[in-house]
Amino acid sequence: MVKYTGQLNRYFKKDSIADIVSELPKPVMTLTDMFFPANRRVQKHSSLISLEDITAETGAVPLVRRGGHSVPVDPNSKTVQFIDLDGIIISRFFKANEVNDLIASGDTENVQAWVNENIENLRNRISDTTETLVRQALSGKIEYPYATDTGVAGKMEIDLGTPNALTAASIKTANIGDLQAWLEKTLSEHAKKAGSVSQPVFLLGSAVYSKVVSIVCAAQNAPVLWTAEGMKLFGKYDIRSLSMTYTLPGSNSPVDVIGANKMRIVDLANPGKLIYAALDDLDANLAPMPFYCKPQEMKDPDGIKLIASSKPLPAFAMKRQSEQTVTTA
């Protein structure tokens, strides 16, 4: 195989990857972008995440990992604990003859197009995995399958806590006036329990959202502004449908992000943080990156493996959220 070092590696430098990713079409990460815009994403320059950092966001020590460990250190007689976070590592393999033909052509544009296409494919898969983690984390607990070097499957278990429980409600026979009263009462109860109402959003399960829409549509001249995400009602209440699911690796069963008869209030001004830990990769300079990709020469069979990695942890502030069971029928 034509030696690729220096011929492909230059396309995979940190700055080159960052430039490629910045020019790619933005991946669809609906909940990740809703809860964790750029100012809520934090890069930690360590492969270990301090429990104190997460506790500051969530109000609770969050992690129990089956088969894993936390790492205690004792500087100046003060015990600090760190999470040894698992990362996302995926790859694509290319046979030697494919790479030979590509490099031997000497066409820089073809090589760059090949690099871009495969970086986009791997970037999208990591983005999809991050979105799945965020969707599952909204429940307050992550139980995500992972594989070890020996091929033994396990689970990364992260317990972020539970949202505040609100008094159950019924909108079974509600009219538009009852709907406003319910929203205001619910928001008031949330404020007392969560202490945060800067930018509240009502996230409704499928049955609740469908019922709210029917009530609004049945009312004449209801003060509603329809949006791409849902509706703004009475000029105050940001209401969105959360009829979404996620599917874990190895499963064919989709899981609802929230139940059909559930309502969740989240403060978009204080949802928590999406933390990226430093990668265990010297070629990446052990840096925290939402996405990194590099080529690795393989033998038996000969070829190149493109390896992509990321270490995300969606740390929701669960005590700033509230959940309610709503009867609709």
Question: What residue spans do the PLM features occupy?
Answer:
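Sequence/fold signature of self-assembling virion shell proteins
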Residues: C217-A329
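Hydrophobic alpha-helical segments and helix pairs
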Residues: L8-A18, S22-P27, A137, A147-D178
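Long, contiguous amphipathic alpha-helices that act as assembly "spine/axial" helices in icosahedral shell
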Residues: I83-D159, H190-L203, D302-A308
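Assembly/oligomerization interface modules of large self-assembling protein complexes
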Residues: T32-D101
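Extended, solvent-exposed, turn-rich assembly/linker loops in the middle of proteins
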Residues: G151-P223
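N-terminal alpha-helical "arm" segments
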Residues: M1-S46, R320-A329
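Short glycine-rich, low-complexity/disordered patches
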Residues: D33-M34, Q199-P200, W226
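Short, solvent-exposed loop/turn segments at secondary-structure junctions
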Residues: Y144, V208-Y209, P312-L313
